[in-house]
């Protein structure tokens, strides 16, 4: 169901409802941006929030929100009525409301009646059913932007407050995974001891929930493409030059006319709050120290407003654009990003439907097992669990109807008309023919990408596509800016791509893992690691500037040994 239909239906329900008695003003859920703090000073403060969310809430790769799948707030805040003295609710009473007929959830210390919202929920009814009568604070905050409650619910849905000591009786306390993560965070070594991006992933495996690791790490189906992307970098070898004056190294360049001190950018990657309470804001703060370009994900767990509000005045952020099937909504989102100051628009074109991400799906299937506590509750209540699962499907891949599956090359003109003077980049290109079409239809750049190997399993690694462009139409590399991502982890990976003609290389998962473990300090450290590796490798390769990186400096051993001309 589209957000427009959700809003219309909710407003109709509210119009038909009888006036509610005056109540005190609702408490806001939006917190002001927390000041930057190092991992060592933050300790375990609030780090457990959002880390041990129930596996039933991680599906596909879009992140299944309890209330809203879109972090972009398109509407003005819905009016909140005055509330009187809040009614005290016991855990036992909350737990009773766990069916379609009466469904309550607890967020922080507040109890909400979401019965009339179940069928309207953009993420589907099942995820609400699985968490009915429970405390959902951790999972809610880990994947939802602030003000989500205020956007979709009114004071009529407010039931009362639950005593803090009662919350643990409905799942609000620390479970075994919470305690494991809390202890692992206490044992984190100093961020300055990390020497490469791979270490951030190794460290994150200890401090992330099973759900977060599945979401961040999964590829599509057999994960052939996920494996192949790492191997692709190893199939390109250097042909270094020696006896050159290598004391001074210059790594400055421009992306889409935007100056950058390094030929790297932060690729869009969603749900950073699964790893850290500050989520995408950590990445913005860490990147600000280095002035490299960050492409803000449309699937972020912070709202677009939250993300842009913590950037430095001169910091450059671009925005990832999933074109909504409702062009009016698509235009509203685009206008909002531009109004906030997005310097470029990265149009994602490789998601006409969501890929089959089996690590996510297997984890969710386990949570839907008949013996799962929620299923046991259904059974006790007389629900037909097997019939429900059979009808809706265990995988329950999130509905992607809001993404325009009919998006085509003619739509590029529509986007350019609504973003005059702003660079447009096509993200998700997988062959030389589509690079040619991108140039033909007026795009300023392309990102050779497989969506993190999360879409079409068996698709070629982006680096192999870059080699194809170099072989079949090398002139394109001077006519349109070509970027590449796909499991790059090293400064040497960046140089290999630049030797083959890429303008720059995007890093996604590496920054997710870095911020998960160490917040903004982790992002800062990751960039410093890459900077050092790039400069060191340039000296060893014999290149003083990025312009000195030439095709003849590499040898490609797949699909055949070949030295580019």
Curated annotation (Swiss-Prot):
One Pfam family here: FMN_dh
Catalytic activity: (S)-mandelate + A = phenylglyoxylate + AH2
Bound cofactor: record note: Binds 1 FMN per subunit.
Cofactor(s) annotated in UniProt: FMN; heme b
Cross-referenced Gene3D superfamilies: Aldolase class I, Cytochrome b5-like heme/steroid binding domain
Keyword Iron: yes
UniProt-recorded Gene Ontology molecular function terms: (S)-mandelate dehydrogenase activity; heme binding; L-lactate dehydrogenase (cytochrome) activity; metal ion binding
Keywords associated with the record: Aromatic hydrocarbons catabolism, Electron transport, Flavoprotein, FMN, Heme, Iron, Mandelate pathway, Metal-binding, Mitochondrion, Oxidoreductase, Respiratory chain, Transit peptide, Transport
Subcellular location field: Mitochondrion intermembrane space
Transit peptide residues according to the UniProt entry: 1-54
All copies of domain Cytochrome b5 heme-binding, residue ranges: 86-163
First-listed, main subcellular location of the protein, grouped into a coarse class: mitochondrion
Residue sites binding heme b per the record: 121, 144, 215, 364
Binding site for phenylglyoxylate: 215, 322, 451, 454
SUPFAM superfamilies the record matches: Cytochrome b5-like heme/steroid binding domain, FMN-linked oxidoreductases
Domain FMN hydroxy acid dehydrogenase, chain residue ranges per copy: 189-559
Pathway, per record: Aromatic compound metabolism; (R)-mandelate degradation; benzoate from (R)-mandelate: step 2/4
GO terms classed as biological process: lactate metabolic process; mandelate catabolic process
InterPro entries linked: Aldolase_TIM (IPR013785), Cyt_B5-like_heme/steroid-bd (IPR001199), Cyt_B5-like_heme/steroid_sf (IPR036400), Cyt_B5_heme-BS (IPR018506), FMN-dep_DH (IPR000262), FMN_HAD (IPR037396), L-MDH/L-LDH_FMN-bd (IPR037458)
Active site: 451
Family: In the N-terminal section; belongs to the cytochrome b5 family. In the C-terminal section; belongs to the FMN-dependent alpha-hydroxy acid dehydrogenase family.
Subunit and partners: Homotetramer.
Biological function: Catalyzes the oxidation of (S)-mandelate to benzoylformate and enables utilization of mandelate as substrate for growth.
Protein name: (S)-mandelate dehydrogenase, mitochondrial
Lineage, opening ranks: Eukaryota, Fungi, Dikarya, Basidiomycota, Pucciniomycotina
């Amino acid at each position: 169901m589209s957000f427009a239909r959700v809003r219309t239906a909710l407003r109709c329900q509210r119009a038909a409802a009888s006036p509610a008695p005056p109540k005190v003003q609702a408490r806001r859920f939006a917190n002001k941006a927390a000041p930057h703090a190092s991992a060592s000073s933050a300790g375990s403060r609030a780090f457990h929030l959002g880390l041990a969310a129930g596996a039933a809430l991680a599906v596909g790769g879009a992140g299944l929100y309890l209330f809203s799948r879109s972090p972009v707030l398109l509407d003005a805040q819905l009016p909140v009525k005055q509330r009187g003295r809040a009614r005290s609710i016991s855990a036992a009473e909350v737990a009773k409301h766990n069916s379609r007929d009466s469904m309550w959830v607890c967020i922080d210390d507040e109890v909400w009646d979401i019965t009339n919202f179940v069928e309207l929920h953009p993420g589907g009814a099942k995820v609400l059913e699985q968490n009915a009568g429970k405390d959902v604070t951790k999972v809610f905050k880990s994947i939802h932007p602030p003000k989500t409650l205020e956007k979709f619910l009114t004071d009529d849905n407010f039931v009362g407050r639950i005593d803090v000591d009662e919350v643990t009786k409905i799942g609000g306390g620390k479970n075994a995974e919470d305690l494991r993560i809390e202890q692992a965070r206490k044992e984190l070594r100093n961020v300055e001891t990390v020497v490469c991006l791979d270490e951030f992933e190794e460290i994150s495996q200890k401090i992330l929930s099973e759900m977060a690791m599945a979401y961040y790490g999964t590829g599509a189906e057999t994960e052939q493409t996920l494996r192949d992307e790492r191997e692709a970098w190893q199939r390109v070898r250097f042909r270094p030059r020696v006896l050159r004056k290598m004391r001074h190294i210059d790594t400055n360049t421009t992306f889409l006319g935007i100056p950058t001190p390094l030929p790297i950018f932060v690729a869009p990657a969603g749900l950073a709050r699964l790893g850290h309470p500050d989520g995408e804001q950590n990445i913005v703060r860490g990147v600000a120290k280095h002035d490299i370009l960050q492409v803000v994900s449309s699937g972020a767990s912070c709202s677009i407003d939250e993300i842009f509000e913590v950037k430095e005045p001169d910091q450059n952020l671009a925005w990832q654009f999933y074109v909504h099937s409702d062009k009016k909504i698509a235009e509203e989102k685009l206008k909002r990003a531009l109004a906030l100051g997005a310097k470029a628009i990265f149009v994602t074109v490789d998601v006409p439907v969501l890929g089959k991400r089996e690590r996510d799906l297997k984890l969710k299937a386990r949570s839907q097992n008949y013996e799962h506590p929620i299923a046991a509750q259904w059974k006790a209540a007389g629900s037909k669990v097997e019939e429900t699962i059979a009808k809706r499907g265990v995988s329950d891949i999130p509905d992607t109807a809001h993404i325009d599956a009919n998006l085509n090359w003619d739509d590029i003109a529509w986007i350019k008309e609504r973003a005059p003077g702003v660079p447009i980049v096509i993200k998700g290109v997988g062959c030389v023919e589509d690079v040619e079409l991108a140039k033909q239809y007026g795009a300023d750049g392309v990102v050779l990408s497989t969506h993190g190997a999360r879409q079409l399993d068996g698709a070629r690694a982006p680096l192999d596509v870059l080699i194809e462009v170099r072989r079949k139409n090398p002139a394109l590399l001077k006519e349109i800016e070509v970027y590449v991502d796909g499991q790059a982890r090293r400064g040497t990976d960046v140089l290999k791509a630049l030797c083959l003609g890429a303008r720059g290389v995007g890093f996604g998962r590496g920054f997710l893992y870095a911020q998960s473990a160490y917040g903004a300090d982790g992002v800062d450290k990751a960039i410093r690691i890459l900077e050092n590796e790039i400069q060191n490798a340039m000296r060893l390769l014999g290149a003083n500037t990025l312009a000195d990186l030439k095709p003849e400096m590499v040898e490609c051993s797949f699909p055949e040994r070949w030295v580019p001309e």
